[in-house]
Amino acid sequence: MGLKVIQQNVHKFLQLRFWGWWKLYNKVKPLLNVARQEEEMKAKEEELRKAMAQTQELVNKVKELEEKTATLSQEKNDLTIQLQAEQENLMDAEERLTWMMKTKMDLESQISDMRERLEEEEGMAASLSAAKRKLEGELSDLKRDLEGLETTLAKTEKEKQALDHKVRTLTGDLSLREDSITKLQKEKRALEELHQKTLDDLQAEEDKVNHLTKNNSKLSTQIHELEDNWEQEKKIRAEVEKARRKAESDLKMTIDNLNEMERSKLDLEEVVKKRDLEINSVNSKYEDEQSLNSTLQRKLKEHQDRIEELEEELEAERAMRAKIEQNRKREAELLKLRRELEEAALQSEATASTLRKKHVDSMAELTEHVESLQRVKSKLEKDKQVMKAEIDDLNASMETIQKSKMNAEAHVRKLEDSLSEANAKVAELERNQAEINAIRTRLQAENSELSREYEESQSRLNQILRIKTSLTSQVDDYKRQLDEESKSRSTAVVSLANTKHDLDLVKEQLEEEQGGKSELQRLVSKLNTEVTTWRTKYETDAIQRTEELEETKRKLAARLQEAEEAAETAQARAASLEKNKQRLQAEVEDLTIDLEKANAAAAALDKKQRLFDKMLAEWQQKCEELQVEVDSSQKECRMYMTESFKIKTAYEESLEHLESVKKENKTLQEEIKDLIDQLGEGGRSVHELQKLKKKLEMEKEELQVALEEAESSLEVEESKVIRIQLELAQVKADIDRRIHEKEEEFEATRKNHQRAIESLQASLEAEAKGRAEALRLKKKMETDLNEMEIQLDHANKNNSELVKTLKRLQQQIKDLQVQMDEDARQHEELRKQYNLQERRLSLLQTELEEVRSALEGSERSRKLLEQEVVEITEWHNEINIQNQSLLVVKRKLESDVQRISNEHEELISEFRLTEERAKKAMMDAARMAEELRQEQDHCMHLEKIKKNYEVTIKDLQAKMEEAEQLALKGGKRTIMKLEARIKELETELDGEQKQHVETVKTLCKNERRLKELVFQTEEDHKTNQRMQALVEKLQNKLKVYKRQIEEAEDQANQTLARYRKTVHELDDAEDRAGMAETALNKLRTRHRVAGKGITSV
């Protein structure tokens, strides 16, 4: 089979040697192997040196064996001489035996002595172990004592912690009492303030009474004037008299109320005096408790000092644990201290319980006082409210006489106008809300469709990119494997030719050696027949022909020696030739197997190459299509982003509009409240105004409900918009992550484009975050605005109360004028800030334009890269055409490529086990070195035995000669014995020689295996180093890319932070300006209302 394959290959080589591609391959092949030629030459030279050394060793061994055979023949002649000395040796052996018996007796006596010594040492060891156990028991007792001391220490520490806890509880109770005292003092201050307020109210009421008396005097003058015009104006006089009577009745009622208030004032003063007495008593109790607390703290300090002393004593105990007597004394002291601590704890508990009782009693008294004060306070507040209601009624009755019906009608007209405006604004808001809802639904639908399409395109792109990367990696691997296999195939062909030549030579040598061996065997058989014939002759004619027998025996011995030497040399040569033959056959089989595998792998690789070329073309087309889709989807994404930004701006404008509507609604509500107050002042038109009031309240409630609904719907819309924004941000994050992954796979071709896209994505994310941050700040500002509006409402109420008195109102007007000046100044400052922010915004816009220009540059670079990709694809198509021309050559290598791919997978799986194999190889090497050492020892032993046998052979030869001399006398028995002995020795010598040859073979095998293992370990180490270097390179590249990404992100974050800051400052400035303007408008309206009230008064 191997010969057929070789013949086929030679035939194909002769056919294809003039083929153009084969010439090109022969020209290119040395260039590929130039880097490895020197290494291969060195390896071959080393192998040649090793082979030469081995052959030299074999030649030396053959020479040594020849010399040994010569020496053996000489020793065989000397055996007869040694036979004489055998008897002397036997005597010497008997003497040695006697000596050995004596030495045996001596050794037995020494053994008995050693046993006695051993028993003594065992007794000593037993005593030592008993002492050790005793010491261990003492040590365990000491440990138990130590543990008891540590438990006592832990108990004392626990008691100390309990005391600390009690002290803390006592201090907590004291702090609670102090808090209760502070609360009482605060309530006292509140009562004093309430008392002062009631006094101020009384003063105000007295002022009002004076004012009423003045009004009464004015009315009396008017009555005098009306009496003069009695006849002309009867109706007017009757009304005036009614009003006068009503005013007089009201005056009487106010005077009665004033008297009652004076009485309540006296009662309040008495109550305040009582409370002062109670507070003094509470203060005295507090002082007593403080003194008690100080005594307790002193005791606590004493206990703490005592505990510190105990801790110091305990530390001294730890230092003096070895002294048991002192420990007992200290235990007694500890018991005393425990008793003292328990007594102190009992005392402290008793004092704590007394303090708790006192505290509970004082708290109960204080609660009773507080409840009584609260009751008084509620009573006073009720009286105050009654007085206020009566005063308001008096004021209303006095003002209704002076005011006319025209004011009420004018106010009603104003209310109707404001209500119509509010209804129009509400209708506009509803329309805006409906438009926003429609836009939102449309955007949600478009967003969902876009996200779905984008996810599908991303998934397809991911799959394509994965397949492309895997295919490119497979192509590279196959190309590399194909190159390696072509190299290995060429080397295998060369080595196969060499081995064939060597095999032919070895076969010729083997045939020659076999012929020589057969001739030697024939000669040996001939000699054996001659020996047997001469032996028979010798047996028959031994007595008669002793001289002839000696001569023939000598001749036979010489011929036998020559034959044995020739046989041994032939056997050695035959063994070496068989070894060479087996080795060469094994190498030839391995090479043929490798060649078949290489052919199979090459064929498989050729098939895979064709399939891969088709798949690559298809995937390139798909990749281009997907690239177009990705570009279109990115454009659409940008369009939708712009639309979403527009919607956001529209939404923000609607929110601003809603806030302005809310503010107007609040102003309208304030005006409605003012009008309701004014409507209550009408005299005759009270019922009409009440009807209008009810109507307005109903409309106000309806407006409030509508506003609440609008606010709730707006809140819902805001939450939906925020959720949409979050979903958009999440989608953006997913898109960015996927794009980032895909661009990492296209690192080699699209680095610049990747960086630009990543920076833009980071800027978009940062912008979205900035938007979210701005919305959050906006909400915060809205809450602050609401709080400010609430505060303004409270201020408005206070102002409405202060308007009643003219002095306070004038002072307030002055304050407001000052505030207006400050607001104007702040407004100017805000204008300046706004101008600054506009400048900053223009700078940011320039920066954005620069970023856009950079993006356009990246787009241009991307287009250039795409053109390069197109050129590469064209070049790849040309290479594919060239590859198709090489398919004929690759078909032969398919089987080899398949085998190599399988081996590659096996190597990948076995790569993890290389270190274990290396360890095993090292262990095998150590074991083989040990075996080699043992074999060397065995060889040395065999050589010693051989020398002994040589000596014995010499002795036997000497004895044989003596026996031959005594053959005439001794007869046949001695000759038979000596010949049997010679045969046994010869067989033993042959067996030892065979064993020696086998040991040499095993040594060679072990050395070869050791070299292979060492070579394998070195290759595994090199592959590991290469893999580590590759991993380090990849890690360095990753670090560089990460650093570049981080720098780009930092730059983007800085620019976005500047942009956010400017936007935030601009929004703040606009909000402050709006707030200032609204405050100015409110102050102006209030100023107008106050001016009208003053003019009317």
UniProtKB/Swiss-Prot annotation:
Provenance organism: Homo sapiens
Keywords annotated in UniProt: Coiled coil
Family that this chain belongs to: Belongs to the TRAFAC class myosin-kinesin ATPase superfamily. Myosin family.
Cited SUPFAM superfamilies: Myosin rod fragments, Tropomyosin
GO CC terms of this entry: myosin complex
Protein task: Has most probably lost the function in masticatory muscles contraction suspected for its homologs in dog (AC F1PT61) and apes.
Protein name: Putative uncharacterized protein MYH16
Coiled-coil stretches noted in the UniProt entry, renumbered to this chain: 31-1087
